[in-house]
């Protein structure tokens, strides 16, 4: 599995780029405190070559960190399942790293999976780094409603997140299970999120 970019443009693709104020040099923000961004730059010519070779070699394409334009380049120029390894629902949290409902449907429609991200700034309605299990459950419910029972897995991003974390590390994952149960997820839905959906994609692709 490989993502085509991180937080900066490279020779393959671009992320959503924060828009800077011409006067102050700072990043412009919306009313919820999220950075405004330019989503228009997608894959480069080399990026299009890479995704073709990745599919030929059986590699899984990861669209987390890609710009919106890059996401739709993947949709239009590939045929196999792809993943968003650590992204949430933009409808519930306006951060540019999250997926719109149309994106969630596109991942699900291709048979891919989205990894639920535990970072507070990707979970909350405002730019707040406090990571709460209740917000994880809310994003999970929304993504299942939009994309169906097969679209969601786990993408905690423990190695890259900070802030006040209700789940500190993988030894505390039972807190997520209990939170999903409190939010009335079924046992089958929870099993799908914990491992079945991701394993399905791996077995199909690898």
Regions found by a protein language model. Name each.
Residues 5-9, 59, 64-69, 87-90, ...:
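Active-site beta-loop-alpha junctions enriched in small/polar residues
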Residues 12-14, 92-99:
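Short, charged, surface-exposed secondary-structure boundary motifs
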Residues 18-83, 96-110, 134-150:
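Histidine/acidic residue-rich metal-binding segments in metalloenzymes
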Residues 61, 86, 114, 157, ...:
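Conserved, mostly hydrophobic/aromatic
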Residues 108, 113-123, 127:
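A conserved active-site cap/scaffold subdomain adjacent to cofactor or substrate pockets
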Residues 117-118, 147-170:
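Short acidic/histidine-rich active-site segments
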Residues 168-206:
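Mid-to-C-terminal alpha-helical segments outside catalytic/metal-binding sites
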